[in-house]
Amino acid sequence: TAAADAEAGDTLEMKYAKLLTIVKHGDGEGASGAAEGVDYQYAEALVANPWKAGTMLHRYILIPKGEEGDKTVVMLAKRRSTGARCTTDTVRTPVERSAVFIAPHCQLMYELGCQQAIRGVCDLDYINIPDVKKRAALSGNTSAQNPIVNCGSSMAPDIERIIALKPEAILLSPFENSGGYGKLDKLHIPIIEAADYMESSPLGRAEWMKFYGMLFGNEEGKSNGISGSCEPKADSLFAKIEKEYLSLKAQAAGYRKGLSILTERKTGNVWYVPGGQSTIGILLKDANARYIFEDDQHSGSLAMSPEQILAKGKQVDVWAFKYFGGAPLSQAQLLQEYDGYKALAAFNRGNIYQVDTSTVPYFELTSFHPELLLREFIILAHGERFGKLRFYKK
């Protein structure tokens, strides 16, 4: 079982991530080729089910490519029982061909230097990474190097295109009660369920990059264009992000309590706002900003009526929200959307900040870089002593 293996292995320290456990087994001695420099015979990544406490969502056995890895595959096949408590996939590493359904993970792969392993994407229109667009435009050009295939919508991907890609892994976002992945499940390609977005700790999600670093490369200067070693790069990048985040948090704590911030706008008859223990709720707290739902204990979104928001948040100082496409929304346009916005003090004072996620790589950059979003909220709450806003515009 996973628990028995974990006892025998070397468990990596996860300081913030609650949904991911990584256990390394063996010392990797005798490894050669693609596996050279790997400090384990195989590794186990256990993803906890975010929607059902005490259960596992998925289990991955990462086995380096090469002859030693081939022997490990045979050895584990003999040893393992078939009674696993969750889906188990064996992934040979480094993964050199993948279909990546999630834009922030594409961005992370560029930062780790393993972008050439991206061979297919979904929801191309929503990806704010110029090189991905450029490589996707080369799709169908037989002489092009490392083109990217547009695999359609992540909700209904083009199965034929994915089969033609021959990916070694598919990265996607799992959802509660999804009932599986339909035809994707039948391809017998490892599906990496990237549940990192369900981590409530901002640094918890970022810490998952250690897992992705292990997936996408260990050998220096690979011939397919994967430069450097993704695993140590991920470790050092996370250490840098953590240091910057904690430094910003400490600086913000030295100021008086900041302005109150309200996020998002009304959608239909509902106004979704972050729970007090959600990623955004924690970011606002760490920015030493005031938040009308800071005492709430939910780690997800709160579905509120507009009347509930206005009753509690009329005196809010700053209103910051995201929108997709088109020009920034004027106050007149916002009132056309919902006349009740005029009851907000922030609206009347003109303290409205917007970010267009169709042109600004907000999700791509902030998902694994919480320090960038923390800085943004600190500026909104305490003024520009921390510099200029990067994402939001007044």
Residue ranges of model-derived segments:
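N-terminal ligand-binding lobe of clamshell/alpha-beta domains
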Residues: 1-394
